[in-house]
Amino acid sequence: MLKEFREFAMKGNVVDLAVAVIIGAAFGAIVSSMVADVIMPIIGAVTGGLDFSNYFTGLSKTVTATNLADAKKQGAVLAWGNFLTLTLNFLIVAFVLFMVVRFMSKLKRKDEAAPAAPPKPTREEELLTEIRDLLKTKK
């Protein structure tokens, strides 16, 4: 049973999938940092210093806090600013992945665009062709 598991785990698809998951997680962290540390501050500067992740709407009268962390302690809140930030994060990840897939597709098409020259006929095929031609002329 251990041997079967080892054979399964070492198949190309399983190993490729594991590598893809690890790279995907690292890529997600990079994009999250790009959104939180680069894009959102720029958007905040353009909109007058707004930090969308701290926007919320209290769902009860007991919520009087002005920041999200304290408001969550006071009661139920609708953290729509955080949702907006995560949605923007998703859109950026999706766009970057789209660009990567598009680039890879272009490379693949470029490789496919140059078809390989047909292989030269083997000596055996040449002889058979000559024999065929001789038989045709004898008829």
Swiss-Prot record:
It is a multi-pass membrane protein. One of its GO terms (cellular component) is plasma membrane. It is found in: Cell inner membrane. Keywords: Cell inner membrane, Cell membrane, Ion channel, Ion transport, Membrane, Transmembrane, Transmembrane helix, Transport. GO terms for molecular function: mechanosensitive monoatomic ion channel activity. The chain crosses the membrane at residues 19-39, 81-101. Gene3D superfamilies: Large-conductance mechanosensitive channel, MscL, domain 1. InterPro entries: Mechanosensitive_channel_CS (IPR019823), MS_channel (IPR001185), MSC/AndL (IPR037673), MscL_channel (IPR036019). Disulfide bonds: none annotated. Channel that opens in response to stretch forces in the membrane lipid bilayer. May participate in the regulation of osmotic pressure changes within the cell. Belongs to the MscL family. Homopentamer. NCBIfam families: mscL (TIGR00220), PRK00567.1-4 (NF001843), PRK13952.1 (NF010557). PANTHER family: LARGE-CONDUCTANCE MECHANOSENSITIVE CHANNEL, MECHANOSENSITIVE CHANNEL MSCL. This is Large-conductance mechanosensitive channel. It comes from Nitrobacter hamburgensis (strain DSM 10229 / NCIMB 13809 / X14). The lineage of its organism: Bacteria, Pseudomonadati, Pseudomonadota, Alphaproteobacteria, Hyphomicrobiales.
